[in-house]
C-alpha cells in the first residue's frame, strides 16, 4: 500500500513538472510569435522592447492568468455541483458580465474608458453571483442551484441579444466579437485586472481538502464534518469573481473550464491537491497555444480565441473519451 502511494505521488510530481515545462515553453513561444517573429536574443533590442515588453508580455500574462482561472473554475464547479458538465458559463456568471458591459456601453453612449467597462463587467458577474448565493441560502440542493444558474444564464443571454439587435451603436455591434473572446486589446492598462485574479487563484489552489470532500458528494461531505453551506457560498463567490475578471479581460471563452479538468482526470489526476495546480498549468498552456493560433492563422486579422479553443479542443476531448472507454 505504501509503495503504491509513493508511486502515485511520484507520478503526480512528474505530471506537474511536465505541465510546468509545457506552460513555460508556451509562454516563450507566445512572446516570440507574431507578424514579426522576435527570438529571445533580440528581446532587449529597440524592436524587442516595443513588441515583446510593451505589447506581447501583458497579453501573454493575461492569457496565462485567464486560462488558469477558467480551468480552476471548471474543476471547482464540477466538484461543487457533482456534475461533469459544470463549467464557468453554466452558472450564468459569464453572461452576467456581458450584460454589465453592454449596459455600460448603452448608458455611457460609448464614452466610458476601458477600466470603467471592466468594472461594469465585474459588477454584472458579481450581481449574478449574489443572486446565486441568495438561492444557496435557501438550502437548495446542488442540482436545483445548478438549474437556477442555467436559467439566469438564459435570461442574461436573451437580454444581450435584445440589446444588440435593437441598437444602432457601432460599439455595441463590436461587442459581439468581444463576447467570442479575444486578447487583442489587452495592454499594461489592464494590469489591475490581472492582479485581481492572483490572490483568488492562489487561495483556491490551497483548498484541496474541502474540494476532495465535496467531490465525494453532499452526504459524504456532511458526514465528514464539512460545513457545506459555508463552502458552497465561498466557492460560488470566488468562482464568480474569477469569471467576472476573466470576462472583463478577454470576453467569454468556452471549452477551457469544461475540458481541461476532464482531460486531467482521464490522465489519472483525481486528487485536488494535484488537480487544482494541474488545471492552472494546463489551462494556462492551452489558452496560450490557442492565442498563438488566433494570432497567426490570418495574416491581416485575428481570430476570436473562443472559436480556436472549441475547434482545437473538442476533437482532442472526444478522442480521450473514446480512448478511456476501451
Swiss-Prot record:
Cytoplasmic side: 1-10, 82-92, 139-141, 207-228, 268-274, 325-326
The keyword Transmembrane helix belongs to this UniProt entry's keyword annotation: yes
SUPFAM superfamilies attached to this UniProt entry: ABC transporter involved in vitamin B12 uptake, BtuC
Any single GO CC term annotated in Swiss-Prot or TrEMBL for this entry: plasma membrane
Any one biological process term the GO annotation gives: cobalamin transport
One Pfam family matching this protein: FecCD
InterPro entries the record matches: ABC_BtuC-like, ABC_transptr_BtuC, ABC_transptr_permease_BtuC
Membrane topology, from the record: Multi-pass membrane protein
Ranges that cross the membrane: 11-35, 57-81, 93-107, 114-138, 142-166, 191-206, 229-249, 258-267, 275-296, 305-324
Listed GO MF terms: vitamin transmembrane transporter activity
Broad class of where this protein is predominantly found: membrane
Locations listed in the record: Cell inner membrane
Entry similarity comment: Belongs to the binding-protein-dependent transport system permease family. FecCD subfamily.
NCBIfam families named in the record: PRK03784.1
Free-text function comment from the UniProt entry: Part of the ABC transporter complex BtuCDF involved in vitamin B12 import. Involved in the translocation of the substrate across the membrane.
Subunit structure: The complex is composed of two ATP-binding proteins (BtuD), two transmembrane proteins (BtuC) and a solute-binding protein (BtuF).
Name recorded for this polypeptide: Vitamin B12 import system permease protein BtuC
Species: Escherichia coli O6:H1 (strain CFT073 / ATCC 700928 / UPEC)
